[in-house]
A protein has these predicted regions:
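Active-site phosphate-binding and catalytic loops of NTP-dependent enzymes
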Residues: 31-33, 100, 172-176, 199-211
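Conserved glycine(s) of the Walker
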Residues: 17, 156, 247
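Conserved C-terminal guanine-recognition region of P-loop GTPase G domains, centered on the G4
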Residues: 52, 76-144, 217-219
Length: 294
């Protein structure tokens, strides 16, 4: 039996639906999703296994002009997506006209590997607008195969996955056949808490936050978690905690509910808030939190 395996890397502007697409492919909620830009900070692998294939999907941060060291590290994750891909997915949304970084766009149109351009959120368009967008992207990225999809509604997602399987090279599996991702449990705890902060706080607060899980103890029925929420200033610490701890308690309750669904066990979670001044511009702290891969 012929076995296929390969890396399928997803890139695009912020908030075009990259994480929604990967979750749809994998069938699990590996990447957190919010309406805020820069929700995805790391490169996250999701693995889909079949008897004769292994598809390794990579969700990457949205492409931006970096303003500080953490964002530079995020863009390094995107650059690495060009280096090991067997198939490249360039994801755009209805109404979008260009990638925010010309250098990345040039890499796409000169790619030596198959490129699938997925025109997402077509449920928000009419037929005339859709046809105009398809013509636009055919001209801009002539080397790409174009698929109109709705990742949220699962429209055309199976068709795209079938095409990916056709394009993958013959290869043995790269990961164990029961693997779902390359990330450890603590990573998903951190991301779940960060998602709830993104959903519950406004302005700069969500972007100044990093999560570190110091304790993850699992037995047959319960997982005990101790996590620290890092912020950059004392004022941010006060906002995260809220009046009499109400805001932090709300985040903890929401995170616990999602983590119990994810792990299938009862969760006991403790969260604390600490000030870690200017961590987003500290190379030492970025390495500690898994951003700096150099």
């Amino acid at each position: 039996m012929i076995h296929k395996a390969g890396f399928v890397n997803i890139i695009g502007n912020p908030n075009v639906g990259k994480s929604t697409l990967m979750n749809a492919f994998v069938g699990e909620r590996l990447s957190i999703i919010t309406s805020k830009a820069q929700t995805t900070r790391h490169r996250i692998l999701g693995i889909v296994n079949g008897d004769d294939f292994q598809v390794i999907l990579s969700d990457t941060p949205g492409i931006i002009k970096p303003a500080y060291e953490m964002q530079k590290s995020m863009m390094d994750f995107v650059k690495s997506a060009f280096e090991d891909a067997d198939v490249l997915i360039y994801m755009v949304e209805i109404g979008e006209k260009e990638l925010k970084d010309e250098a990345f766009f040039n890499k796409i149109i000169h790619a030596k590997i198959p490129v699938l351009l997925l025109l997402n959120k077509i449920d928000k368009s009419d037929q005339e607008q859709l046809e105009e967008q398809i013509d636009l992207w055919k001209e801009k990225v002539p080397n790409a195969e174009i698929y109109p999809i709705s990742a949220l509604e699962n429209f055309n997602v199976k068709e795209v996955f079938a095409r990916i399987l056709e394009l993958l090279p013959e290869s043995p599996a790269y990961y164990p056949k029961d693997a779902l991702t390359d990330k450890p449990e603590r990573f998903f705890v951190n991301e779940t808490i960060r998602e709830k902060i993104l959903l519950n706080y406004d302005k700069e607060i969500p972007y100044a936050v990093e999560i570190e899980t110091e304790e993850f103890i699992e037995d047959d029925k319960i997982i005990r978690i101790r996590s620290v929420i890092m912020v950059e200033r004392d004022t941010q610490k006060g906002i995260i905690i809220g009046h009499k701890g109400a805001a932090l308690k709300r985040v903890g309750m929401q995170a616990r509910e999602d983590l119990e669904k994810f792990f299938g066990k009862q969760i006991h979670i403790e969260m604390f808030v600490k000030v870690n001044k200017d961590w987003r511009n500290s190379q030492f702290q970025l390495r500690r939190f898994g951003y700096n891969q150099k």
